[in-house]
Structure formats: C-alpha cells, structure tokens
Amino acid sequence: MTKATPPTLAAGALLWRNVEGDAIEIALVHRPRYDDWTLPKGKLEAGEHLIECAAREVREETGAIARFGPLLGQVSYDVEGEPKNVTYWAARAVEMHEPTAESDEIGRVQWLSPGAARAVLTYGHDIEVLNSFLKIGTGTLPIVLLRHAKAVKRSDWDGDDDDDRPLDSRGEIQAQRLRSTLRAYGPLEIHSSDANRCQQTASLLSDKFAAPIITESSLSEYSYKRDSEAALSRIKQLLQLERPLVICSHRPVLPHLARALLENTHLDTPTASLEPAAAWVIHARGGVVIAIDYLSAPE
C-alpha cells in the first residue's frame, strides 16, 4: 500500500489595520506566479513554530509587524497534487516597513475594506478565513495560560521542597524558544506562580519582553490545594485588567483557571492536560472571553 504524502505545513494571518473611526482594512497580497489575490502565508521552516512562521511571513510579504489575536482555523487543499495545510490567525498591523519578499513571489500588497476584500480574494477558503475573522471581530487581548517548561522529575529531585524543583536542560531550551513563540502576541505582562520552575520560565520571557515578573503565590500548585477559591478569584481579577498577560502556572491548576475564565460563555472548556511549555490562549474583549486557542509547546 502506498503511503499517503504528508501535507506541507504553512501558516499565515488575516492581517488588518484600523483606519478612520471603527473602520478596518484587510491586507491582500498578489502573487505573480499564480496571478491570484490571497492572504499572506508561507511554508514552515525547520524548527519553527506555526505562529512564528505566520508572523515571519506577514513581515516578509507585507512589511507589517503584527500583534496576533485569535486562531481562525486551518484550511487544507492540494497544490500541484500535493496536500497543504495552512493555519491562520487574526493579526493587527502595528508597525509598517518595506516588504522583503522577492517581487516575483509577492508583486503587490493591497489594503481593502472587508467587503472589497471578499470580492477580490481568489479562493473560497480565504473567504472562509475572512468570515471567521469578522465573526470574532477586533479589539481582543490575549491571556496566555502557560504551563512552565519541562522540569526535573519529582522522582529525580532530592530537594526538601518541591517548589524549589528547577527546569531540566530540555526545559531551559523550551523556555528560551517560548520567547520567539509568544512574541507574536506582542509585549506581555508576566504573572507567575512562586514555584522555581515557573519563575525560571517567566524569567526568560521577562528578559525578552522587558517586563517585570509579578509573583502570584495563589497560583502555585500547593497554594491551590490549600485555597482554590483564592486562585480562582485572582484569575478573574486578572481578566478584568484588560491587558495582554502571561500566567505561568502548573498542569493541575491551569484547567481550573481556564474553567473559571470560561464561565458563562458558549466556549468549550479544555479537557486535555497541557504538556510542558504549552498554553491555552484566552482572547477577551472588555473583560469578556470570546475565544480560546491551544498553543503547542515549542520544539
């Protein structure tokens, strides 16, 4: 039996910008090779996270440095008989530079109203991405519920206090890679459990975002066991700050934090546990959660 060809993985964004009032414009790119109008996207490079790929391709093809918002989904289609999967996010242009893509790859960038973009887009799957974006809307802020990077196993730790258990060598690499992954969401305020493995993870992010670490003792694993209501009350307070945040905590605690944030929404509560350095990204507008995404751990 012939093995199925694995799909080519790619990522991109529905890139938008504010214009007058509440109006927005969408970026479309023209590809001379195909003579089509599409959304900025490109193939995944070795060792690259999908959201990193999307941010890089947006920068190369449009010149925009973007702040990423909700995941809009994945589209699949064939290119010259080979399968391709493209993952898209919403992304707001916050700074513009000259595109760096070759002119035979991207010939032109055009900013259009959503209605005009729908009429110009060549492919139906791009229109579906646009529709998903319009359904969610703009003005969201992320809260990244992050599990700390990989730590030394409890069975291998001979310290007296489990809160002192550090990252292992793999976890240190993961924490460094998280800086590139989470950069797509823009500058983030960092809140962390007081456990050493969380503080180490947060410290590497703090260096990248030039942000202080705000220690949240109520969000540690053992504090949650003693007083779960304090942790749940605190995460709801953090939601009302209406600022982009990273909350670094623990596998047993994070599902409860997510459930508290998703109360009174139509969204499904995550059921699977997060692996080290993975996250759920909550997107909120006006202190109300409107979307939740899964963000896999960096390689």
Predicted regions and their residues:
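N-terminal strand-loop-strand
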Residues: 2-39, 143-148
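Short beta-strand micro-motifs in enzyme catalytic cores
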Residues: 9, 25, 83-89, 278-280
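Short, well-ordered beta-strand micro-motif
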Residues: 15, 30, 88-92, 111, ...
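Short, solvent-exposed aromatic-acidic interface loops
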Residues: 29-34, 293-299
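Active-site-proximal alpha-helix that buttresses catalytic centers in soluble enzyme cores
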Residues: 42, 47, 53, 139-226, ...
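Unchanged
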Residues: 44-68, 74-129
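Non-catalytic terminal regions with compositionally biased, polar/charged low complexity
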Residues: 126-128, 132, 140, 259, ...
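Active-site-adjacent alpha-helix immediately C-terminal to a catalytic or transition-state-stabilizing loop
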Residues: 232-290
